[in-house]
């Protein structure tokens, strides 16, 4: 009970700070952010059957009433054809007796509404902190953008740093717990800061390293930081009495260095097992994931480094076993591609290889300290998209495909005008979907291909192929359904302790539904559905028609490859599929999978007889 009371005090303190700060922010921006947080929250509460509610439909419009203690909340919403997703279409009213007032007070709503499961006050208050921090940081971001409007994007990096709307379903889409507003300004991707990395030299026996074929670590390191910095680092190492071949040089995010390394590894720095080398000169911008650093010099590698913060409800550290799997999975995927002429020569899919992974693993530390630094120090080196583009090609992140410029004009507007909305959309869907279903059906591999993990490669706006990234914890398979080319992979097992804190993070499973729905959830439910809804809103192409095009692309693939056994194991046309309950995960323990069944727009039935099945 004491913990809960402390959390209440913490919340009120945050609210006081917010109230004071809001006196100087643009009220229009503030209202827009509060409304977005409120709408995404309420949509997810209904969608995941978290709250007790009533719904009735008149002329296709849903009238919803959420039950509260001594109050109720009313609004209208539509149920889309895309997995029954809820889109709120009116202001939300709080009703007490005969009085009704429009509200965006999501903290009051969460404390008043009746849940469908026993309410955990501590988890609830922690979730409220995430929502408040999302409101703070998105308001800060939008106000900064208004005062410093970015130029119209032209290159991949421009789009990467411009499209900063965040998750369109998750209500705490920009929480960044652990960052102050000052930290957010210095390290948040919304502000396109120039960031320099700190570097450590660590005794090799304290580091687990995984290296892709044909990679020479020190040569790659020298190319990344430059000859002058590399030689300076070597001198530092030798001055400490060590040899460069006896240590590993690992980059550290400056926030992580200040808040974690300097504190939790102070003893190791003092006894010399961890040596601080200093700062390198090359500049990086943080990508939308925050922990992936994008070099301004596009000849260099992306560096994914842990930051001990929480964003969209996920810890942004790097679990050691996933780092240690990075290069193996990269070599596995690229070997599959070399043996698959359709994937290599027709689809020409790009896999941005994670060619080097290093994680700090000191078994001599006490169990307590090992827990403290778990996943807090390590790096994954990833190939740069610019290394892969040829001739007239350019690339754009998938999340930028449903984003707009400062005047509200979609980034894809000129392409739609040039090629026509129907022709462009059909081409885009074919280019995006065929590689994903080929890897699933032919090789038995599903990818967690949400918008941050996919890039569209195009020639003058015409979609030609895709690039994929983030494989170290973003693929899933059932071994008996792998193709011969894919059957030879040895993985570092997930520690039992990691399963207890994140039961959703695994690569291999015995449940084939969890393979199929891994693709359905990230790719179709979050990624493609968002683009389809955007196309309908902006260009008037009916949502249901677009899903028929998607279904046609899958059926055409099956006709071209009729012999594949995996069609019976990974049926993308089943009436319902399982998707993750993202908000429920914040309100209950994360020790088990939180999933529910939703209507599949590719399956039989459809919107007219769709119901979301409640699973608590």
Curated annotation (Swiss-Prot):
Induction conditions: Up-regulated under iron-deficient growth conditions. Repressed by Fur under iron-rich growth conditions.
Catalyzed reactions per annotation: 2-[(2-aminoethylcarbamoyl)methyl]-2-hydroxybutanedioate + (S)-2,3-diaminopropanoate + ATP = 2-[(L-alanin-3-ylcarbamoyl)methyl]-3-(2-aminoethylcarbamoyl)-2-hydroxypropanoate + AMP + diphosphate
Alphabetically ordered keywords of this record: ATP-binding, Ligase, Nucleotide-binding
Enzyme Commission code: 6.3.2.55
Pathway in which the depicted protein is active: Siderophore biosynthesis
Pfam families to which the protein is assigned, alphabetical: FhuF (PF06276), IucA_IucC (PF04183)
InterPro entries reported in the protein's UniProt record: Aerobactin_biosyn_IucA/IucC_N (IPR007310), IucA/IucC-like_C (IPR022770), IucA/IucC-like_synthase (IPR053631), LucA/IucC-like (IPR037455)
Root EC class: ligase
Gene Ontology process terms (BP): siderophore biosynthetic process
This protein's record includes keyword Ligase: yes
GO MF annotation list: acid-amino acid ligase activity; ATP binding
Membership in a protein family: Belongs to the IucA/IucC family.
Subunit architecture: Forms a mixture of monomer and dimer in solution.
Name of the protein in its database record: 2-[(L-alanin-3-ylcarbamoyl)methyl]-3-(2-aminoethylcarbamoyl)-2-hydroxypropanoate synthase
Organism lineage: Bacteria, Bacillati, Bacillota, Bacilli, Bacillales
């Amino acid at each position: 009970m004491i913990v809960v009371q402390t959390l209440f005090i913490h919340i009120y303190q945050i609210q006081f700070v917010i109230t004071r700060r809001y006196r100087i922010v643009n009220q229009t921006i503030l209202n827009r952010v509060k409304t977005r947080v409120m709408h995404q929250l309420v949509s997810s509460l209904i969608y995941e059957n978290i709250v007790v509610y009533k719904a009735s439909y008149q002329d296709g419009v849903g009238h919803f009433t959420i039950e509260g203690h001594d109050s109720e909340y009313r609004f209208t919403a539509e149920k889309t054809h895309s997995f029954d997703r809820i889109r709120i279409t009116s202001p939300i009213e709080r009703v007490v007796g005969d009085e009704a007032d429009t509200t965006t007070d999501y903290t009051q709503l969460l404390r008043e509404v009746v849940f469908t499961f026993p309410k955990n006050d501590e988890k609830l208050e922690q979730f409220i902190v995430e929502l408040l921090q999302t409101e703070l940081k998105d308001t800060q971001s939008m106000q900064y953008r208004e005062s410093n409007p970015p130029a119209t994007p032209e290159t991949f990096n421009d789009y990467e740093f411009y499209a900063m709307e965040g998750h369109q379903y998750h209500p705490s889409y920009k929480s960044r717990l652990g960052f102050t507003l000052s930290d957010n300004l210095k390290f948040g991707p919304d502000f396109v800061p120039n960031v320099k990395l700190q570097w450590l030299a660590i005794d090799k026996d304290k580091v687990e390293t995984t290296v892709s074929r044909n990679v020479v670590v020190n040569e790659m390191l020298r190319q990344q930081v430059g000859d002058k910095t590399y030689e300076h680092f070597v001198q530092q190492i030798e001055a400490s009495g060590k040899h460069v071949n006896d240590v590993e040089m690992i980059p550290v995010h400056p926030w992580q260095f200040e808040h974690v390394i300097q504190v939790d590894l102070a003893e190791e720095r003092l006894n010399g097992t961890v040596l601080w080398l200093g700062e390198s000169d090359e500049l990086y911008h943080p990508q939308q994931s925050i922990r992936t650093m994008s070099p301004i010099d596009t000849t260099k590698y992306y560096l994914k480094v842990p930051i001990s913060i929480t964003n969209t409800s996920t810890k942004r550290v790097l679990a050691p076993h996933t780092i240690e799997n990075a290069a193996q999975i990269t070599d596995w995927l690229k070997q599959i591609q070399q043996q698959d002429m359709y994937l290599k020569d027709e689809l020409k899919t790009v896999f941005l290889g994670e060619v080097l992974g290093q994680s700090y693993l000191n078994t001599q530390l006490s169990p307590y300290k090992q827990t403290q630094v778990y996943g807090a120090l390590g790096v994954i080196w990833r190939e740069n998209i610019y290394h892969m583009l040829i001739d007239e090609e350019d690339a754009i992140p998938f999340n930028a495909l449903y984003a707009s410029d400062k005047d509200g004009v979609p980034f894809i507007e000129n392409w739609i005008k040039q090629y026509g909305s129907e022709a462009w959309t059909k081409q885009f869907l074919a280019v995006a979907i065929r590689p994903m279903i080929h890897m699933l059906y032919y090789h038995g591999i599903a990818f967690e291909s949400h918008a941050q993990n996919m890039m569209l490669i195009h020639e003058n706006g015409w979609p030609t192929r895709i690039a994929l990234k983030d494989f170290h914890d973003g693929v899933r398979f059932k071994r008996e359904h792998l193709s011969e080319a894919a059957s030879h992979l040895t993985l570092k097992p997930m520690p039992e302790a990691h399963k207890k804190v994140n039961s959703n993070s695994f690569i291999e499973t015995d449940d084939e539904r969890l393979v199929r729905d891994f693709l359905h959830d990230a790719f179709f439910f979050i990624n493609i559905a968002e683009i389809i809804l955007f196309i309908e809103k902006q260009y008037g192409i009916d949502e249901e028609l677009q899903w028929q095009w998607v279904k046609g692309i899958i059926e055409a693939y099956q006709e071209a490859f009729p012999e594949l056994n995996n069609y019976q194991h990974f049926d993308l046309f089943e009436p319902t599929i399982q998707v993750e309950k993202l908000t429920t995960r914040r309100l209950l323990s994360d020790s088990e999978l939180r999933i529910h069944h939703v209507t599949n727009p590719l399956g039989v039935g459809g919107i007219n007889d769709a119901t979301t099945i409640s699973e608590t």
